């Protein structure tokens, strides 16, 4: 073989190996790499992931579905059914699910207009169903829905392109104690402020850290400066977990957020019991 040809082939091979070694992982691979291990579940549950928005459609909906699929596979906690069809909320169908993931389904009230379907859904939760609400699942709803979720979207001064301070207000709580080892942190995402939010009816786990300079400079609407980011609650016999985080795609493969979400699912499915009693807002430092 002539030397120039040999060198050319060697260069091509080297470039191929370099490209292979530097290939960016897919979003699914990132979710899988960062999905935490959990305690072995006592059973396999059934979860509906409902992803139909009736307002703004987030481009993170698809990776939300990927996250659900990977969590189901890697933890063995549940089997998941994906749907954008409201017939899944019919009485004979909804009862088969142990919990429902509301995956960025903005303005659900605009789709679920039938009063009987609304009543069926709310009673499903009151009678023991679980709700795992991501980001814009808190945007809209009707009176009973907002009561069940715990708050209603009222703008987002903390935009998706910014990095904001998050206070872990309940660092010993099972759902968040392993997130950054219970410490405060910063994260890049869109953070909501809420109306119809009453801390005494929710167990706030995380909230905006207004002592963080960029976060504190934004003008929120609440006189009490209470901007919850994640909480748990009971609604009748049902269990509800809410995450304001979930606008940016990166949240769905963020290793620390996945820790919280995995434990949130264990709670809403009834795999573990956690304290949902309200705690006062910590005094500002």
Where are these regions (language model features)?
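Extracellular ligand-binding/catalytic regions of CAZymes and related secreted enzymes
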Residues: 22-42, 62, 73-75, 212-229, ...
